[in-house]
């Protein structure tokens, strides 16, 4: 991805975050003039934002804001933010941390070949020291090899991505389903076996549409707020 293309997307996202839903963007020609880039670069950037669900286009009318960047990224569940909104103190305990080869199924999720290495870790998420969520996560080892257990316990994962690696999340795919806890999850959270829970499957992508996080979360149904 060219630096001009990447920078234009960042600049457009900044402007879109200030616009109202349904607002019309300047014409392609105006964007070319404003950002000093070619029409090809403008079209590629707009196409990316359309495919990401941030903009939509109407033939003969132009390009419009479907949802501001801030709104779009706040639609996914953030345990840290939600816990603070509820007036509680969030905390993460790293229960396990390992660097290993991804399984065939995991390689398929990341669209990588056999031998692909991941950092695999399990976290217990607490609110005022009460266990609320059990999470297992995978991130690419070669890209984030300096991440360790201590760093994961010190600040949110997405803050690590952005502040330590300059990797901003631009697209998140989540799937929610009602489930029941396994014996291991229930025991860790001091709950009865097969306690009801909300299962969250999350895939997080960067600007280049590379998958940089695959997480499965199990949230206790009796205290979970979203």
Spans of features found by a protein language model:
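Short glycine- and basic-residue-enriched patches
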Residues: 28, 74-88
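Residues in the recognition helix of alpha-helical DNA-binding motifs
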Residues: 45
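Beta-hairpin "wing" of winged helix-turn-helix
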Residues: 53-60, 66
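Conserved hydrophobic residue
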Residues: 21-24, 55, 131
């Amino acid at each position: 991805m060219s630096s001009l293309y990447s920078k234009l997307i960042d600049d457009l996202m900044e402007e879109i975050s200030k616009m109202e839903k349904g607002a019309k963007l300047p014409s392609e020609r105006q964007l070319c003039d404003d950002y000093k880039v070619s029409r090809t670069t403008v079209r590629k950037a707009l196409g990316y934002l359309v495919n990401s669900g941030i903009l939509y286009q109407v033939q003969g009318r132009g390009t419009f804001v479907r949802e501001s960047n801030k709104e779009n990224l706040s639609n996914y569940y953030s345990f840290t933010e939600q816990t603070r909104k509820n007036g509680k103190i969030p905390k993460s305990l790293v229960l396990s941390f390992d660097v290993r080869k991804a399984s065939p199924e995991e390689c398929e999720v990341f669209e990588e070949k056999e031998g692909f290495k991941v950092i695999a870790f399990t976290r217990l998420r607490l609110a005022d020291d009460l266990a609320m969520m059990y999470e297992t996560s995978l991130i690419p080892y070669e890209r984030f090899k300096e991440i360790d257990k201590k760093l994961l316990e010190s600040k949110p994962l997405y803050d690590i991505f952005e502040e330590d690696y300059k990797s901003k999340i631009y697209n998140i795919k989540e799937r929610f389903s009602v489930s029941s806890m396994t014996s291991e999850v229930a025991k860790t959270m001091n709950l009865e076996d097969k306690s009801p829970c909300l299962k969250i499957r999350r895939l997080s992508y960067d600007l280049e549409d590379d998958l940089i996080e695959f997480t499965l979360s199990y949230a206790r149904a009796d205290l979970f707020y979203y």
